[in-house]
Every structure is written in C-alpha cells, then in structure tokens.
Curated annotation (Swiss-Prot):
Organism (species): Shewanella denitrificans (strain OS217 / ATCC BAA-1090 / DSM 15013)
Gene behind this protein: bioB
InterPro entries: Aldolase_TIM, BATS_dom, Biotin_synth/BioAB, Biotin_synthase, Elp3/MiaA/NifB-like_rSAM, rSAM
GO molecular function: 2 iron, 2 sulfur cluster binding; 4 iron, 4 sulfur cluster binding; biotin synthase activity; iron ion binding
Binding, [4Fe-4S] cluster: 56, 60, 63
Pfam families reported in the protein's UniProt record: BATS, Radical_SAM
Entry protein name: Biotin synthase
Assembly description: Homodimer.
Keywords: 2Fe-2S, 4Fe-4S, Biotin biosynthesis, Iron, Iron-sulfur, Metal-binding, S-adenosyl-L-methionine, Transferase
Role description: Catalyzes the conversion of dethiobiotin (DTB) to biotin by the insertion of a sulfur atom into dethiobiotin via a radical-based mechanism.
Length: 357
C-alpha cells in the first residue's frame, strides 16, 4: 500500500496506531506526505468575519455565541453588505486569499438567502475565494449558495460520534453529515473539521478524523481548532490538552487526508511560535489571519508575518481579481436591499428567537 494513497476505509485501530507512533516517526511520516502534495513553505491565509453575532439557539458547550450561556457577548444583526465588503477589501490588502463569513444561526432562513448570495457575489468580485458557515443547509439553500459562486462551505463535525452528545444536544451528528452531503452535491467544496481539548479521550480524536477521512470525498479544508475556553460556557474550566497531542492530531490528519488543506484554526493566539512551527512541519498549511475569529482572539497580523519570515514561509497567492464586476454588483446590491428590507419590518426578526428551536 502506497504511503500517498488516498483512502476512505480507515479503521479506527489504524488511526489510533498512528497517534501512538513515537513523535519523530509520526512527524517524519506526516511531513513526507505533506511534501508530496503541497509546497511545504506555502500557507493559505483566510480571514474570518462574523456577519451575524450571538443569539444562537444551540447549546454547544464550547460556544460563547449560544443564547443559553451568559458570556457577556452582545448580539448583533446581520451585517450590511457594504460593511462586509469593506472588511473583505481589508482582508485582501492584508494578504488573505480567502474570505470566510460566519453567522450564529442554527440554519439560515429562506428570507436571508438573497442577502447571503449577494454577499458571495460581491466578495468574489474582489478576487477572493469565498467561504461561509451558517449552520445547517437544506438542499435548496446549498444550491442557491453554489449558484452565487460560493467556493467553500464550512460545517464542522466537532468531535467523534461517541463524545458528541456530551458537547451538543440540540443538533444531531447525522444532521451535520447531511449538511456536508448537501454541500458536496451542490458542487461547493467542503470545509469540515473539529475541536480538540474539550475533555474528549484520545480515541475521540481518532474517531473524529476517521469520520472525516471516510467521507465519500475528503474535505477540501480540515480546520483543527484548539478549544478556546470562554467564561460563562460549560467548558470554561475544562483541563487543558497537552500541546503535543494537538500536534499529533495535525499530523494524523495530514497522513489520512493527504490532499486536504489542514488549517490551524481557533486557539492559535495562545500557542507558542515553536508549537505553531511544529504544526506547520506536521502538515498544517492554512491559517485564519487577523486579530479575531468570530468572537475569540487570534494572533495579530504583524505577529503572523513575523513568524512566517522567521520560518521562511510565504502566503499562498489568491485568484486574480475581476474588479470591474464590483460596480455592477454594488448596483444590484442596493436594489436587493431595498426589496428585501420590506420583508423585515422589525429589526429583531433578523435574529433567531433563542428560546425557539
């Protein structure tokens, strides 16, 4: 069996055996595979913007945006498209090649879709890859986003099926898999990963990666998050994960999903430069860039560029910018907003009722 073979039939015992390798052997295997598929000194940079913050009805025990927990987070309405475009332009100027937009929803409502599809069109017109994370998607919603040109859709599995019920009770594991299936069927690329350091066992980290690697097609991007403990959430006092276990998770993800981008996501703000360097060597080749990830802290842009310089890394170049499309899209946007505003007489209707599931 080739070291570089793409497989979808991983046994959990095989993955656990990879986790158990001596660190030097694991890193050597992961880095060898990484060099086969990617330039090891190139890192894809994404910017993540919260386009609708707080008041989420879900009970994810790690999340400060849940309406069920008192975290001091102020809820915000869906951002105007012009504000999103301003942030997207800033992201591109700072070196990002992908712009991700996240909304704290269980799922978008149909009346939200015109706004969302216009956001996608306008951001793409700037020459950025686009990604959204909006919660669960129906088949029709997936098709609308794909039709607008959305490149990636993020929907994480979070953890293993076995540990999932200890983290979330308001959304089933199968519903997450169904959303990924809808996204893939629509033609969009899938971004899906999980969170480690939530009190799970090593077998749960193996189980999460098994679920991702055994999808019919591997996710195009696999974000691996280190839990950011937020006061007011049920997981605020959970024990820290050994940082080397995080590195092992990155390395195993690279080995069993050799063609996927593996992203260092939440938690980087508290990671040392040395730890991040190990993660890049282990196969991580994507980061979120900017001082905030939705509502949690992230390293400053200057810090990231300084680290890149010290490590000899360089940002991946994004697609060419069809800037001439922007004026046309902005005209369309103004007409769309005028039409859609008639459907939203009350500002509070732009939120989900946190008490209604």
């Amino acid at each position: 069996m080739s070291l570089f073979e793409v497989r979808h039939d991983w046994k959990k015992a095989e993955i656990e055996a990879l986790f158990a390798l001596p660190m030097n052997d694991l890193l050597f295997k992961a880095h060898t595979i990484h060099r086969e598929s990617f330039d090891p000194n190139e890192v894809q940079i994404s910017r993540l913007l919260s386009i609708k913050t707080g008041a989420c009805p879900e009970d994810c025990k790690y999340c400060p945006q849940s309406a069920r927990y008192d975290t001091g987070l102020e809820k915000e309405r869906l951002l105007e498209i012009e504000k999103v475009l301003t942030e997207a332009k800033s992201a591109k100027a700072a070196g990002a090649s992908r712009f991700c937009m996240g909304a704290a929803w269980r799922n978008p409502r149909d009346r939200d879709m015109p706004y969302l599809t216009q956001m996608v069109k306008d951001v793409k017109a700037l020459g950025l890859e686009t990604c959204m994370t909006l919660g669960m998607l129906s088949t029709e919603q997936s098709q609308k986003l794909a039709g607008a040109g959305l490149d990636y859709y993020n929907h994480n599995l979070d953890t293993s099926p076995e540990y999932y019920g200890d983290v979330i009770t308001t959304r089933t594991y199968q519903s997450r898999l169904d959303t990924l299936s809808n996204v893939r069927a629509s033609g969009m690329k899938v971004c899906s990963g999980g969170i480690v350091g939530m009190g799970e066992k090593a077998s749960d980290r193996a189980g999460l990666l098994q679920q991702l690697a055994n999808l019919e097609q591997h996710p195009d991007s696999v974000p691996i998050n280190m839990l950011v403990k937020v006061a007011g959430t049920p997981f605020e006092k959970i024990d820290d994960l050994d940082p080397l276990e995080f590195v092992r998770t990155i390395a195993v993800a690279r080995i069993i999903m050799p063609k996927s981008r593996v992203r260092l996501s939440a938690g980087r703000e508290k990671m040392s430069d040395e730890l991040q360097s190990m993660c890049f060597f282990a196969g991580a080749n994507s980061i979120f860039y900017g001082c905030k990830l939705l509502t949690t802290a992230n390293p400053e842009e200057n810090d990231d560029m300084s680290l890149f310089k010290r490590l000899g890394l360089r940002p991946e170049q994004g697609p060419a910018a069809p800037v001439a499309q922007v004026a046309t899209n902005l005209d369309q946007e103004q007409a769309l907003i005028a039409k859609a505003s008639a459907l939203n007489e009350k500002a509070t209707q732009q939120f989900y009722d946190a008490g209604a599931l």
